[in-house]
Amino acid sequence: MDNNPNINECIPYNCLSNPEVEVLGGERIETGYTPIDISLSLTQFLLSEFVPGAGFVLGLVDIIWGIFGPSQWDAFLVQIEQLINQRIEEFARNQAISRLEGLSNLYQIYAESFREWEADPTNPALREEMRIQFNDMNSALTTAIPLFAVQNYQVPLLSVYVQAANLHLSVLRDVSVFGQRWGFDAATINSRYNDLTRLIGNYTDYAVRWYNTGLERVWGPDSRDWVRYNQFRRELTLTVLDIVALFSNYDSRRYPIRTVSQLTREIYTNPVLENFDGSFRGMAQRIEQNIRQPHLMDILNRITIYTDVHRGFNYWSGHQITASPVGFSGPEFAFPLFGNAGNAAPPVLVSLTGLGIFRTLSSPLYRRIILGSGPNNQELFVLDGTEFSFASLTTNLPSTIYRQRGTVDSLDVIPPQDNSVPPRAGFSHRLSHVTMLSQAAGAVYTLRAPTFSWQHRSAEFNNIIPSSQITQIPLTKSTNLGSGTSVVKGPGFTGGDILRRTSPGQISTLRVNITAPLSQRYRVRIRYASTTNLQFHTSIDGRPINQGNFSATMSSGSNLQSGSFRTVGFTTPFNFSNGSSVFTLSAHVFNSGNEVYIDRIEFVPAEVTFEAEYDLERAQKAVNELFTSSNQIGLKTDVTDYHIDQVSNLVECLSDEFCLDEKQELSEKVKHAKRLSDERNLLQDPNFRGINRQLDRGWRGSTDITIQGGDDVFKENYVTLLGTFDECYPTYLYQKIDESKLKAYTRYQLRGYIEDSQDLEIYLIRYNAKHETVNVPGTGSLWPLSAQSPIGKCGEPNRCAPHLEWNPDLDCSCRDGEKCAHHSHHFSLDIDVGCTDLNEDLGVWVIFKIKTQDGHARLGNLEFLEEKPLVGEALARVKRAEKKWRDKREKLEWETNIVYKEAKESVDALFVNSQYDRLQADTNIAMIHAADKR
């Protein structure tokens, strides 16, 4: 910027940034976890993982209920206290935090019980435990939530009220979905479902009511008041209204499968000005008028920024927005010019790239300019420059800079929803619009301040309709409004604005894009409120689809509340004819002057059942639990090779039509798990490609051992060992683990899966033999004994047919001195290794043996792997065993040497020389027999 001699004062901008956030080299570095961060993560979770099951339960634990302590809950209270300038009394504060702590502790117990039950859902004790835990959790929440609505503190307690309400609805949904499997009777389940639907409305209306009360409370006439008003609106949209907008999805009978919602509401960062929070009297209303009125959602394509100059200072003087409707890229339309089209520099074009603009770094400029002697001072409040950063899930995209990059970071007030990835991928909002606060007061001051509007990233651009989920599309994503239809402010719980009609006619047209096969059939549902009975008509590309009569939901003049809206549908399914289609909704057969409000439409796959969704969720959970972390770096130690094969079966049995992409992704993860399992397995040829193939490596065994391909029990090869008629010649299978593969002072584990066995002896030998005899009845098949193993169309085992539940957490290890339980198909045997010596190459011998006529065994998925380093008594014990073995070996060597020496002397005495080619003259047959006995 050019220097100007008329400058008298230059005040650096105080960005009022969050002290827990710094901007370093363009990257946002988090040093704290605020209520807004938590709420954004929760909203992301609810938008992406809204499926009942242990995954959802444990997700709530991970995000909030398992990590929060008193200080984190207090931060939620402090956030609103500061906004409304009201302190919660110490008693009410302590009571609220204590209740939240109690709920957190109780829910962690509930979540663990849920996890255990889901792993073994037919276990009577676990079913009873779930009934107990649900009743305790439901009772605690029913008692606690009214305490978060304490008189005079409803607003400052609002965000924790919503967190508790969300938890309560999730628990009630659990019993609605799983209650029968837990053992509750139908009457109890229906009663709890009725509680769920009633409380969805109650909790929603309460939250919206007190949000509006708080918002009205912080309104005032000056810019300082507007800043607080806008902050309250923005932050409680994130911590309260966004979560409440998803409450209706907890209705498990209306949304039995994965449901995708979208938040189309906008939030606003403050006009980027120096001294904005306190320098402008009576301007709050003027600033609020700068906020965009309710409108259809559009896609921001370009911002053309103009530059003006005032006494040597260049600044953002105006801009023009070019956008397009949702659903397709054209035709574009331009908004009227905001501000004025200055020509002090060429216009700067900011074009949409990647997933949109997720961040702005702005540089406000304030100058007090002395025009001469006397009081003729003029103040300049403008924007000197902005950097626009573009979102991308994969790569860093170059930003666009208007003049210069600043320090006022939009991420400080609208942070990412996922801090585990770069902000460009974890962003929560994208820039949706820019208006201009413009004011001039003659020779007193000049003000030009762009105001940025932001939309949640869940509001996608294309109105995509897949086959595998219920798709909710807000009607504000329509392409065109019918004549007489208007966009009005939403009631607060719809996640955005809504449409309104007061006379019969077309409501809107919506362009949708179908990613499913065109043969996929759907049913349409409409969420509406109306003061009159009416008839809805739907059509696709001008082709009539559905027509139905529906009733009034509210009285004329009533406020819109949760109960005012009803979700209704048509029974006749249909399919789309084109991948890109226009859906039209109309309302007819009612008198003008009535009010009809439309929130959203829903496309429900006609054939999708909850079972398919449950299978996917179960498979995802099973795959994720194979690994030690979410990045799949390592396998959990207790995950067996057999377990991985069973998880692979779960994935292979998923529906291609319902979740092909997810199935392919899970399949790759299972293959990775299998590779990790092979890498840690010290056995050679664990999948039995052959026996006696090589003399010095791999498996050696009896000639009557057979290798068989996978069946309904084993996914891969397994071996069958038969009995023997001669105990001196047992059936055997063995392999030696080379010394070079072993670590000193480490415990190793042999484990595998036995389909059935009788008199199977298992040995691990190093310093001595570890030995177990295992008898497993022939019920190892996943199939009921009364049924024949299912066969696929090509003769292969059908692993996707209904089968008995398999419990991956069954503990059936054989420890020192123990016998395996007779019904444990999983076995494991430990052995401790002391000092290693490559010269001795002692190794570990793995041996399976049957020495009875009735003996037999079928086994596979064998593993020999490192378990843990030896410490303490185990270390001392192996050292004693090693010393005892060495002492015994040395004694045997000493005794052997003596015997050898005596024998050699006896033999030497028989011959005349060391070549042993001629006997002594006196050597006789008795002397030879005596030497032979040596």
UniProtKB/Swiss-Prot annotation:
Name of the featured protein: Pesticidal crystal protein Cry1Aa
Miscellaneous comment as given in the Swiss-Prot or TrEMBL entry: Toxic segment of the protein is located in the N-terminus.
UniProt record, GO biological process: sporulation resulting in formation of a cellular spore; symbiont-mediated killing of host cell
Pfam name, any one: Endotoxin_N
UniProt similarity note: Belongs to the delta endotoxin family.
InterPro entries: Cry_V, Galactose-bd-like_sf, Pest_crys, Pest_crys_Cry1Aa_dom-IV, Pest_crys_dom-III, Pest_crys_dom_I, Pest_crys_N_sf, Pest_cryst_cen_dom_sf
GO MF assignments: signaling receptor binding; toxin activity
Function field: Promotes colloidosmotic lysis by binding to the midgut epithelial cells of many lepidopteran larvae.
Species of the source: Bacillus thuringiensis subsp. sotto
SUPFAM superfamilies linked: delta-Endotoxin (insectocide), middle domain, delta-Endotoxin (insectocide), N-terminal domain, Galactose-binding domain-like
Keyword Signal tagged: no
Keywords: Plasmid, Sporulation, Toxin, Virulence
